[in-house]
Amino acid sequence: MTEKFKKLDPDTAIDIAYDIFLEMAGENLDPTDILLFNLQFEDHGGVEFVETADDWEQEIGVLIDPDEYAEVWVGLVNEQDEMDDIFAKFLISHKEEDREYHVVWKK
């Protein structure tokens, strides 16, 4: 039997991802990237809720059901409003009682 759960709304997923990003970026990003992010985020920063990719197994080594997770990207957007410098990709469980997440940081 399939377990029912309420999916995260985009704003909540974005808030969760951004909070985690701010807390962990210093430990996971190159100091140059942190400086770039801090200098340009106000004008070019973006936190985007995107369609959950089905290739997370390659990133985290675990097969996931894309319907059970939200995906959020944190980065900088260019003049065409496309995110072309991604600092972190987040995979966040929709299950509130078991809110697990995975992060792929910019290398």
Swiss-Prot record:
Q: Name one Pfam family in it.
A: DUF440
Q: Where does the source fall among the domains of life?
A: Bacteria
Under SUPFAM superfamilies, the record lists: Putative dsDNA mimic (SSF102816)
Q: Which InterPro entries is this protein grouped with?
A: dsDNA_mimic_put, Put_dsDNA_mimic_sf
Q: Which family does it belong to?
A: Belongs to the putative dsDNA mimic protein family.
Q: What does this protein do?
A: May act as a double-stranded DNA (dsDNA) mimic. Probably regulates the activity of a dsDNA-binding protein.
Name of this chain's protein: Putative double-stranded DNA mimic protein HS_0995
Organism equals: Histophilus somni (strain 129Pt)
Tell me the classification of the organism that encodes this protein.
Bacteria, Pseudomonadati, Pseudomonadota, Gammaproteobacteria, Pasteurellales
